[in-house]
Amino acid sequence: MAFRWVAEAKRRGAKLIHVDPRFTRTSAMADLYVPLRSGTDIAFLGGLIRYMIENEKYFKDYVVNYTNAATIIRDDFQDTEDLEGVFSGLKEAPQGTNQKYVYDNATWQYKRTAPFDAAKAREEAIKAATFAEMIQKMVPPPAEKDPTLQHPQTVFQIMRRHFSRYTPEMVEQICGTPKELFLRVAEMLAENSGPERTTMFVYAMGWTQHTYGVQNIGAAALLQLLLGNVGRPGGGILALRGHATIQGSTDVPTLHHSIHGYMAHPDARRRHDTLRDYILTETRPTGYWANLPKFMVSYLKSMYGDAAKPENDFGYDWHPKIAGDYSFMASFHAMAKGEIKGAFFFGQNPATSINGGLIRRALANLDWMVVKDNFEIETAAFWYKSPEVESGELKPEQIKTEVFLFPSAQVGEIEGTFTNTQRWIQFHEKAADPPGDCRSDAWFTHQLALRLKKLYADSTLPRDQGFKNLTWDFDYEPGKYPTNTRIQGEPDVMKIWREINGFKTDTGELLKGFGELKDDGSTTCASWIYCGAYPEEGKFLPANRNPDPDDKPGTHLGWAYAWPANRRILYNRASADPNGNPWSERKKLIWWDAGQKKWVGYDVPDFPATKAPDTPAKPGAAGMDAHDGKSPFILLPDGKGWLFVPTGLQDGPLPTHYEPMESPVPNLLYPKWQTNPIAKIYEHERNQLAQVGDPQFPIVLTTYRLTEHHLSGAMSRWLPWLAELQPELFVEISPELAQEKGIQNLDWVRITSKRGSIVAKALVTPRLRPLTVNGKTVHQIGMPWHWGFMGLSTGDVVNDLTSWVADPNVMIHEAKALLVNVEKAK
């Protein structure tokens, strides 16, 4: 659906470049198709960064004024070029982290104009009377800068040295991309960026599913900042999510490490003992995140209602604290060791997920498991129909896991909202009742909570007080329950939205925006970024359906609601020059109106509406007063886009090329450090890794999705039409590799990794081509991962080949580059 807008852009003259290991339908539409070896994106993007710097193709006025290029970094910082592949601060990891190394980022920090003792400031701040006074005491002196960009420790010069060896020749050697194609990409990017033009990067799982996935995206962000393509129409980085409302599931989170609105989850391992400790640890004292106390207190009021009071830290001690790594792989690692007794799986099919064979064996260690889905998926059926049961390794009568399968309503059978990748919250209506016992996730969660509240009602145990005080008032008011349905017991969606949006605690009046939030308990709001979506009774903005007419700019402010504050382009102050004038008339979005003394335009300003461009920063101030009128990036402490990331990333302040955990070749840039030094590896006898250039596993496998299927196939392989469109699992093999292996089209072939072995039909195609990597021929194959052993269309589980290795920032797995062997099946 999204690609129709790409097609429309091409019709209007836009250029489309497609960089991918495989030639796909997107490639066929592209002006330029560029192959590369899977897992080498940072080398490719790093080469583009070097090209823009050395050829002075970067947008200098934007870079100097709107990024931290001019900021000076501490003298003791050392780059990968100084330390042969790692940054300063590398040290051995503590036990239990599933890592060999971690970083101490002290040397990555800005050099300040005066000394600042953060520990001493914290000692004083904790004594302050109010949260605002606490934050004020944590404000550091400003950073040293050199607007000429000549100081050797400026971010610009550090970045220049860091990428100096990412030459077109090095890109060709690492990526296998012909030098001429790479240079054409660089030229096209430069031609389509600057004051008059913008370029957008669009990515999906091809960038994320790596042990350096966050740094892949960081490299693209760095490049876009250099080119002036952030905060402007037609620019930015667009993530194509895996399915509907993935954005919403991180905003109102199903994440283990954050709570609503991207606030950090209270954590027993950090200085989060009290609410004050949490606020001092997590609040950035300058920039908009200085408002964290307002967001957090309002969130706690949404959790505990009248029981949340100033004298009990608004119930902070009742809030659960995480005490370890509860990410996907870590949880199944614990399950494999018998440390988890029960599990819920809503719309999730882990039996076909990463290192699927190990996951299915881990499921057999549970006492009980709840699966809520549309059909009896592989996870629900693992105990009697998995490959391990079929082979006799596991026996159903010996598996103790009791499985509870609850049939789920489908999306057309419920009403609610989706949040898309552009942060638009859109309401959708219900088309029909679900059949039989099928129920929505909201019904299940609501009914479970009501029953648990009854069970805990008489408890006097201190540990249960938080759950007893948890507010749960989502039943319809008497006489208000819908009469056009046979389903009973659904919660009132608009009551849930009241809590998400927020209201004044004493009167119940809905809040019009997050600017009204307070840190004294007078406002209740579950999710500060969604505050304003439901500003008054009868006015639910996600249900708006008023598009711009054709002669308008197309920001569509009357269609749905985009968080925050209905802004359609984040950091849109950057769409105007430092003086507040549009960089370009054809690209103008917001601008400063001196007559009205405010920012005006086609979008809601992502900036203080009345802060003039010539407003100076207030020395020593906290919050937004610390930023001048020329600092668009309001959520960052210095208001500048970060080319160099001093804090927040676990694996370095600049993107650096490392090889995937399994690679056919050594790391040409840094031979001493083959892989990301702080990637997570979950050790298990069934999670072995192939060594560099292992002759038993010489071929690179990348996995992908098909238009006709959805993720593990749980929503598509049961549907006859979709199953007929893509009826069986296949493996794409180049003609050259097929000839070498004696494989014909449609032959059954066996694909084997260090973790597992599967069979599939061969699809011999020139869509994948051999690449020359540092003088060596490297073959790549591709496989879709939608299949499993249940449903109308069945096939082997491709993820049985993958491993439990993860990016250290977000713990995503590496399924886009691994080593396998391919042979004709006997």
Language model features with spans:
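Long, well-ordered, tryptophan-enriched scaffold segments
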Residues: 13, 22-195, 284, 445, ...
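Conserved short loop/turn motifs at secondary-structure junctions
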Residues: 170-177, 203-211, 240-244, 347-352
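Long, contiguous, secondary-structure-rich segments that constitute the structural scaffold
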Residues: 443-499, 595, 600-608, 612-627, ...
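Flexible glycine/proline-enriched surface loops and loop-helix/loop-strand junctions
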Residues: 29-30, 151-152, 164-169, 202-207, ...
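A glycine-rich phosphate-binding loop feature that marks nucleotide/adenosyl-phosphate handling sites
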Residues: 65-69, 188-189, 204-206, 236-247, ...
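Short beta-alpha connecting loops at secondary-structure transitions
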Residues: 28-36, 380-382, 390-391, 407, ...
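Glycine/threonine-rich phosphate-binding loop and adjacent beta-strand/alpha-helix elements that clamp
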Residues: 401-434, 449, 785
